[in-house]
């Protein structure tokens, strides 16, 4: 694996010079191998090690290099044709392969090659970009988008129209991460490498980036870039220091543990916020 990483790191330093026409065989094979490993879930761009999320930057670099070494090509679809550098994940799947991997894909869901989809996942008409990791038992609902290299945990529900930000455009240092057992409400956006920790519930229409203030109304504490575990979050506003205006924020209205979350439905958690 170290040899593979070294090839990627070296090639990335001269990425501006690389084109589909001049990419050498060693680089091309290394990049394709990494994409295949990401696609199978054997590697992932970020993983939790000793309780902390660690981003493997060289894997992200391999994803970026894949755009340098591959030319656009015609991609056949059910209703149309496409022209892109990245093949679709399911292009060569047959019924036996789908059954073996154990997830459902509802048309016209689109998943790029290099994204991993775990067992018991349901993809409604949605989009999952290259390098993303979607873990077991997760629902990606209609028109939800999982951005490049985003990490989605087990038993997560991404509601209709949710946007989970990617790292490639604009280029971000770390992927957006949604940990296990989270619920992200309809039309919410979580971007710029924000981490939503385990068991959190994000209400409909909440927008969280690195500069968004995440205000805990119980403690008065303000978080940036991280939603603490077990938070129930709604959109809100905080007043300016001079009191003349207010600016958008996300508000943690309560905290719940796994036991409470198991007994009380998501809708009930969001309705009883007073």
From Swiss-Prot:
Disulfide bonds: none annotated. GO terms for biological process: diaminopimelate biosynthetic process; lysine biosynthetic process via diaminopimelate. It catalyses: (S)-2,3,4,5-tetrahydrodipicolinate + succinyl-CoA + H2O = (S)-2-succinylamino-6-oxoheptanedioate + CoA. SUPFAM superfamilies: Trimeric LpxA-like enzymes. Pathway: Amino-acid biosynthesis; L-lysine biosynthesis via DAP pathway; LL-2,6-diaminopimelate from (S)-tetrahydrodipicolinate (succinylase route): step 1/3. Its main location: cytoplasm. Keywords: Acyltransferase, Amino-acid biosynthesis, Cytoplasm, Diaminopimelate biosynthesis, Lysine biosynthesis, Repeat, Transferase. One of its GO terms (cellular component) is cytoplasm. Its EC number is 2.3.1.117. It is found in: Cytoplasm. PROSITE patterns: HEXAPEP_TRANSFERASES. Belongs to the transferase hexapeptide repeat family. This is 2,3,4,5-tetrahydropyridine-2,6-dicarboxylate N-succinyltransferase.
